[in-house]
Structures are given as C-alpha cells and as structure tokens.
Amino acid sequence: MLVVEDDPDLGETIVTFLKEEGLDAKLARDGDQAMRLVDQLHPSAMILDLMMPRRDGFSVLRELRADGRINGLPVIVVTAIFGLSERLYATELGAADYVTKPFELDELLERVRNVLASRADEPAATERQTT
C-alpha cells in the first residue's frame, strides 16, 4: 500500500493506522516520489492526495494511465476538493474511489479493503507483489 500525501502529519497518521490494521504501508510525500516508489515497490493499492507540490495527483494518475501502470493498481483519491468535475476527472483517469477530507480513518480503511478485495478478484492481481 502506497500512501501519497504531502501533509506529513496526515500521511504518517494514515500509514501508522494502516500498519496497525495489518497492512504494509509506505509513505510518499509528493507525486515524484510516488512514481519512483510505484516502480520500486509495486504496491497493491495507492491512496493519493490530489493537491501536492511539484506533481499533483491528477498528473500522477495521468502518467499511470498513459503507460498502463494504473491497470491492476487501485487508486483511492483523498482530497479536500469537493467538486463533481474533479471527482469525474479522477475517475476517468482510473481512480477506483474518491474520499473527501476530512474523513474518518475507519471509513478510509473500509474503502481500502474494498478495493483490495476487488483487486483480488482480478486475474492480473496475482502477477503483482503486495506492498
């Protein structure tokens, strides 16, 4: 599980919570680091903030989609942006789910488990490592 969040407190909180729930989670603080870690770790899923410095979440989604890495990688977008157009655009780019801030950690965990369960049902899931 890769958590991409530029707010250090929120990022660490999410990673710690996921680890306490038995999931292996790593933190990337921006979109550039996220792309490097996707290639290194081959995560089972990604939690992705949209508004980040250097490379935003939309840019990450576009790159993942352009080269096919989004296939088999469920991405949950987490953002303070409430707009319907942003939600639709994230979905068009391949996001599996969209959670608005603020959110409850239990709600995020439920969504993570849902996308992981959906991913486990896909044949390509067995070809990727779980991180």
Feature map (PLM): residue ranges:
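Two-component/phosphorelay signaling modules centered on CheY-like receiver
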Residues: 7-26, 115
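Alpha4 helix (beta4-alpha4-beta5 surface) of REC/receiver domains from two-component response regulators
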Residues: 15, 59, 82-97, 110
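Short amphipathic alpha-helix used as the core "switch/output" element in two-component signaling
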Residues: 36, 58-71
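Active-site beta3 strand of CheY-like receiver
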Residues: 41-47
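C-terminal output helix
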Residues: 103-113
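Acidic catalytic/metal-coordinating carboxylates
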Residues: 30-33, 49, 56-62, 94
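The feature encodes the CheY-like receiver
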Residues: 11, 52-54, 71, 83, ...
